[in-house]
């Protein structure tokens, strides 16, 4: 959770991975993210980038693109609209602004995998596109993860929970070196997160609760 420019390198140096989440993006935090990314690169740590709201403003899209170029993320994790926007921008096409930052699923599984693979080829990162069914474009393999519950899409912050899990799983696999199977760590993080959602939804429904209780149960 470090955001100060003068501490991010120290904090990054005692971590096993780095998560760059653009959720509360401000101009003053960008240099800190860049510094953390540089330190992670020196240390060989996996870097997970979540381009939150990349479809909401030009500022967010450009910051995400800059992070891709400067921090060289190992994993890029976003919803379908965010991943499509980054893919378009990196291919030289302007992606327009759309309302909101929450997840939506619009294309077929094949079209979503195609977009994820396209961004993977452009960036060298493992690309994760979350939605009703999560798709992963690994270095050599593609995955579809079907764990989860519809209520999870209604919980603000569920994506941030996933980012944390992904950082933990990738940090563990990062100990195997730069050629460690990060895509497997990513898939396991997605599955674990989805299973937590399924269990939390079942527990909450049994008590007659709603999405507010699901959030607490997931934690």
Label every model-predicted segment.
Residues 145-157:
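Short pre-catalytic strand/loop immediately N-terminal to key active-site residues, enriched for Gly-Thr
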Residues 85, 156-192:
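Short, small-residue alpha-helix embedded
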Residues 16-19, 45-48, 74-76, 125-128, ...:
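Structural motif
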Residues 25-28, 53-57, 135, 152:
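Short, small-residue-enriched loops and turns at beta-alpha junctions
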Residues 1-49:
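Conserved N-terminal subdomain of the carbohydrate kinase-like
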